Amino acid sequence: MSRIGKVPVSVPGGVHVRVSSGVVEVEGPKGVLSCAFLPVVTVRVEQEYVIVARCDDSKRARACHGLYRKLLSNMVVGVSEGFSKTLVITGIGYRAEVQGRVLVMALGYSNDFTVLIPSGIEVRVESSTRVIVSGVSKERVGEFAAQLRRLRLPEAYKGKGIRYDYETIVRKVGKSGVK
């Protein structure tokens, strides 16, 4: 039995879970998320818990059991609290600003990067070097934050680039020079 899959998902107040023909819809104060599940698992709602159980003991069902339970848990947390990732921009002249639904980033190239902010994602710039990406869907928030990070990956010699707030960059020692 999947150790993650057998734990029921707790549903907080204000969040409603609906299951209909393989599609689970979770609605809360921050928004609505839905996900289609394969018929190898069954999802049922009991009072303030959602229980994910597998239909048989096939390899596919065992693989999907914990996955679908965690996806459902992320949906419940997303519509009740939301998810966010913080990016830190390091480098001389590197900065970011939001103009409407566009994020403009100066990252040391001759032209600035303009990135369209997708729907369902909110971007705040606390200081010109700190960008907070937030939203309801954990997958979409992480995907957009990774897309921004790829614009200028942190380099190991000076540490310049875009990194996650929790990330530490292992610095390399440069050339020692002639003695």
UniProtKB/Swiss-Prot annotation:
Main function: This protein binds to the 23S rRNA, and is important in its secondary structure. It is located near the subunit interface in the base of the L7/L12 stalk, and near the tRNA binding site of the peptidyltransferase center.
Entry protein name: Large ribosomal subunit protein uL6
Coiled-coil residues: none
Any one of the GO BP annotations: cytoplasmic translation
Keyword line: Ribonucleoprotein, Ribosomal protein, RNA-binding, rRNA-binding
Protein family: Belongs to the universal ribosomal protein uL6 family.
Source taxon at top rank: Bacteria
Organism: Treponema pallidum (strain Nichols)
MF annotations from Gene Ontology: rRNA binding; structural constituent of ribosome
